[in-house]
Amino acid sequence: MEKTLSIIKPDAVKKGVIGKILDRFESNGLRIAAMKKVQLSKEQAENFYAVHKERPFFKDLVEFMISGPVVVSVLEGEGAVLKNRDLMGATNPKEAKAGTIRADFAESIDANAVHGSDSLENAKIEIEFFFKPNEIC
């Protein structure tokens, strides 16, 4: 069964919409195989988003991701990566389709409520970043 990583970002955690977002996953056929709430350190955020290190938004992204706790989940299901990305909506909430997580809960392109793996390969890497094998069930 395909797995993907989801992060509910600090803006959505602060708004108290964790349950609403998790319900979107479950009601659309994604099973929560692992989940934890964590406060990322600066080093963890920099390592997780290292692929963006040379991008102009990197510093702001890291600062945002350490501004409060996040909820990290492993989602499992048929076509989990694509299904999660469809549920999230466009990166910029202004461009996200009505009914998507970002259209409903995100504030801006920076505070955009959720992160989701963009490929099966990255999902594997991202899941291993946050979870040990025995934490996924």
Swiss-Prot record:
Binding site for ATP: 9, 57, 85, 91, 102, 112
Keyword hit for Endoplasmic reticulum: no
GO CC term, one of those recorded: cytoplasm
Cellular localisation: Cytoplasm
One Gene Ontology term from the biological process aspect of the record: CTP biosynthetic process
Keyword NAD in record: no
Pfam family membership, one: NDK
Family annotation (InterPro entries): NDK-like_dom, NDK-like_dom_sf, Nucleoside_diP_kinase, Nucleoside_diP_kinase_AS
Cofactor: Mg(2+)
GO molecular function, one term: nucleoside diphosphate kinase activity
Name recorded for this polypeptide: Nucleoside diphosphate kinase
Species in which this protein is naturally found: Campylobacter jejuni subsp. jejuni serotype O:23/36 (strain 81-176)
